[in-house]
A protein has these predicted regions:
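Active-/binding-site microenvironments in catalytic and ligand-binding cores
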Residues: 1-216
């Protein structure tokens, strides 16, 4: 049974050394998997933050890594990447991996068992981290701004305010130094007790209130 990829991005690592455990061809091109990586992959179930980019190298040879992805392999050997993964995390019989996509076929030196150096694009990682932090702060500011529009308790966010974010957020796309979130004001939100009519009527005022709270 293969082992899951050991990840170190949570500790802020940008570099590492590891052994290539498999090289696969998929709908995303050539995917290199290593035993341990500092690369942060895009989450295929909630793809808010893009995966890290960077390089794999060995003895003067270098290949570029496109956006790192989630991958998985079954006990029977089925390999899948990103949205093609047919199961949820935690399902027995599957091992979870980080895939490093490269352009074209793998060069002759990039084979199973090879030792490689991994390097993440640091400025891009930092920009995405700032964008992710700003996204969370903005959502908390929005929850504060919309707190009086709830007629029922929707549950609380991390600051104890009514959690509009959790109820209405449909998608979040983080980019360097920012993010774009989309919200749905549908029947389910109204049934949950949110006053969508007042929200629409006072959108301009709420916008400036949210900006003020965010800046504060």
């Amino acid at each position: 049974m293969p082992s899951s990829t050991i990840v170190s991005f949570a500790g802020g690592d940008l570099r590492g050394s590891s052994t290539v455990s498999r090289v696969e061809t998929s709908s995303r091109g050539t995917i290199v998997v290593v035993d341990a990586t500092p690369f942060h992959p895009v989450d295929h179930t909630w793809p808010d933050q893009p995966g890290d980019t960077g390089e794999l190298s060995a003895e003067g040879n270098v290949v570029r890594v496109a956006e790192a992805v989630m991958a998985a392999v079954s006990d029977e050997g089925q390999f899948a990447v990103g949205a093609d993964i047919p199961v949820k995390r935690g399902v027995e019989g599957w091992t979870w991996l980080v895939g490093h996509p490269i352009a074209g076929d793998a060069p002759s030196w990039l084979v199973e068992g090879a030792r490689v150096e991994l390097s993440v694009d640091a400025p891009r990682r930092a920009g995405l981290s700032r964008g992710h932090t700003a996204c969370h702060l903005a959502s908390l500011a929005l929850d504060i701004a919309l707190g009086d529009l709830w007629r029922k308790d929707p549950g609380a966010d991390a600051l104890g305010n009514p959690n509009f974010e959790a109820r209405a957020n449909q998608s979040s796309r983080i980019h360097e130094d920012g993010a774009v979130d989309e919200y749905r004001l549908g029947k389910s939100l109204r049934r949950a007790g949110f006053d969508t009519e007042t929200f629409v009527a006072t959108l301009g005022e709420l916008r400036y209130f949210s900006i003020d709270r965010f800046a504060w």
